[in-house]
Amino acid sequence: MSDVIKNFFKLESAGGILLVIAAAIAMIIANSSFAPMYDTFLHTYLGGMSVSHWINDGLMAVFFLLIGLEVKRELLEGALKSKETAIFPAIAAVGGMLAPALVYVAFNMGDPEALSGWAIPAATDIAFALGIMALLGNRVPVSLKVFLLALAIIDDLGVVVIIAFFYTSDLSVLALVIGFVMTGILFLLNSKHVSKIRWYLLVGFILWVSVLQSGVHATLAGVVLGFAIPLKGKKGERSPLKHMEHALHPYVAFGILPLFAFANAGISLDGVSLDSLTTTLPLGVALGLFLGKPLGIFSFSYVAVKSGIAKLPAGVNMKHIFAVSVLCGIGFTMSIFISSLAFGGANPEFDKLARLGILMGSTLAAVVGYILLHISLPKKAA
């Protein structure tokens, strides 16, 4: 294994540890006498948006840009290059969205108002899932990490579509049109072999603003920009995509992701009782994440492989896939976002119950997913 790849994994592992520490600190503060200060900080307005908004829709767009760059590189010259391998995470993601939603609906069939939260357990929190995986360092095969990246991003893109169609009542048509135009310009630049990153960043910023104003989750702009950055530069030039990926990684690992965890993991447990935890809404969310996710992802993956529709990534077996499918039950921030859309305005009590379910399901998925990965992975990197 080259020194570059070794350093990459060391960096990511350290960033993953910092991410978990930041989340733990947020939980402690949110349930202490410092909770009002924490809340005030997150709701302080800067330039027309709260600090929380800037982190979730601004800085996280940079994280999604990095994800887009990594997935594109793997699609063009890495583990997802072949059609059979590329289709595998897409099929798994479909199962990972359907099964959790069905579990939630089964628990809340008798409550029409609660049913509006059906999409809450359908999401996978890429940041936290990668953070847990990164704790295992270079024991994780590159192909397994890429599978998780691709699966999670397809999953979250699917959730963004769900949000746009089912949870957005005030879409701005003008902003969406501008966003589509900017997307077209980005891929026009790519087709014309423009290799200067500054032009992509300029158009990408306008795309981000338009998506933010459209009512659609602004992080989608980061994904689109990532896929537009060219892999190959002009003759004699370094790869624009690899250069940007290398430049962004330390800022994302040690800055954006820990800050993101700190801003979103602070859920107050004040007033929580055993009775409230065992009602159908939090149970539907928790079991949708902890049971529905692995059930959907693993079953769809198994059928896809056995039928010959897709093939396993190199160096990966079905035990690894099952462990990752459990890890994908970490819905956390995206699930919280959907909960706020489904219940936040109309029913704050339902929103709190859903968040409790998200906390339970995501914690179980993180702990069990880590244990399963620890058991199934080789003790040392090959």
Swiss-Prot record:
GO terms for cellular component: plasma membrane. One of its GO terms (molecular function) is sodium:proton antiporter activity. One of its GO terms (biological process) is regulation of pH. This is Na(+)/H(+) antiporter NhaA. Na(+)/H(+) antiporter that extrudes sodium in exchange for external protons. The chain crosses the membrane at residues 14-34, 49-69, 87-107, 117-137, 146-166, 171-191, 205-225, 247-267, 285-305, 321-341, 356-376. It catalyses: Na(+)(in) + 2 H(+)(out) = Na(+)(out) + 2 H(+)(in). HAMAP family: NhaA. The gene is nhaA. It comes from Aliivibrio salmonicida (strain LFI1238) (Vibrio salmonicida (strain LFI1238)). Belongs to the NhaA Na(+)/H(+) (TC 2.A.33) antiporter family.
